[in-house]
From Swiss-Prot:
Compositional bias ranges of the Polar residues kind: 67-79, 86-95
Location of this chain's protein in the cell: Nucleus
Gene3D superfamilies reported for this sequence: Homeodomain-like (1.10.10.60)
Lineage start: Eukaryota, Metazoa, Chordata, Craniata, Vertebrata
Molecular-function GO term, any one: RNA polymerase II cis-regulatory region sequence-specific DNA binding
Keywords: Developmental protein, DNA-binding, Homeobox, Nucleus, Transcription, Transcription regulation
Region annotated Disordered, chain positions: 59-108, 144-165
Locus of motif Antp-type hexapeptide: 171-176
Annotated S-S bridges: none
Pfam families reported in the protein's UniProt record: Homeodomain (PF00046)
Listed name of the protein: Homeobox protein Hox-A5a
UniProt organism field: Danio rerio
Length: 265
């Protein structure tokens, strides 16, 4: 990354000769321009001859001229290292080991390795991003397919299944023991509708009751088969008929008693 950072500044800053800086140190030399060739080119990479960024001050007073400033830099013991204060010569113009020019940095094996590592890291990140994007797309495709399959299902299938479940009555054990037919049930309370007997059935039952008020189980089964009725219906009809007969006889006896008490010979 260090070589990449240095190489990015090579084409950004032009040579300092094209951009001279005015000297604002002395009021007598306000119109003069400073010679940029006297700057220390060995301090900068890529042969940059721009502004002198030395920060040594010999006196806290007013600003000094260029000659006095260079003299104070040479005389002061706390100034920067010697190689920054030497005049421009062939030896000083040569770049040091820590400030290499752009060409040497570009051709160095360290820079090539760093560039390769950077390219590998970028390619790996791009590959991982593409893989993750592909997985997201595949998941979205699966979800879309599932949603389309759900939409293609006919809406009446779920309703018919729910209707079949609701229509089938739940049969409990006590209902089976009582032999209750669910077709004859009417209303939430489970009351049976009143049985409507035909004229023929009523006449046959009245005839049988006239001869015998109480039926045996065998005779009750025979009458049920003959009249196409259930054994329970025959039993209930005979019970109701006996209650009616008792009521009629009671009224008849009461009337006869009243008539006998009123009749005096």
């Amino acid at each position: 990354m260090s070589s990449y950072f240095v190489n990015s500044f090579c084409g950004r800053y032009p040579n300092g000769v094209d951009y001279p800086l005015h000297n604002y140190g002395d009021h007598n030399s306000s119109g003069q321009c400073r010679d940029s060739t006297g700057m220390h080119s060995g301090r900068y990479a890529c042969g940059y001859n721009g502004m002198d960024l030395s920060t040594g001050h010999s006196s806290p007073g007013h600003f000094l001229s260029s000659g006095e400033r260079t003299q104070s830099y040479k005389d002061s013991p706390t100034a920067t290292p010697v190689r920054y204060n030497q005049p421009v010569t062939a030896s000083s113009a040569e770049p040091s080991s820590d400030h290499l020019p752009c060409s040497s940095l570009a051709n160095s094996p360290v820079s090539e390795q760093s560039h390769r590592a950077l390219k590998i890291s970028l390619s790996s990140t791009a590959g991982s991003a593409s893989k993750s994007f592909g997985t997201v797309l595949s998941r979205e495709g699966v979800s879309k397919v599932s949603s389309s399959m759900e939409e293609e299902k006919p809406p009446g299938s779920g309703q018919t299944a729910s209707q079949n479940v609701s229509e089938a009555p739940q049969i409990y054990p006590w209902m089976r023991k009582l032999h209750i037919s669910h077709d004859n049930l009417a209303g939430p309370e489970g009351k049976r509708p009143r049985t409507a007997y035909t004229r023929y059935q009523t006449l046959e039952l009245e005839k049988e009751f006239h001869f015998n008020r109480y039926l045996t189980r065998r005779r009750r089964i025979e009458i049920a088969h003959t009249l196409c009725l259930s054994e329970r219906q025959i039993k209930i009809w005979f019970q109701n008929r006996r209650m009616k007969w008792k009521k009629d006889n009671k009224l008849k006896s009461m009337n006869m008693a009243a008539a006998g008490s009123g009749y005096r010979p």
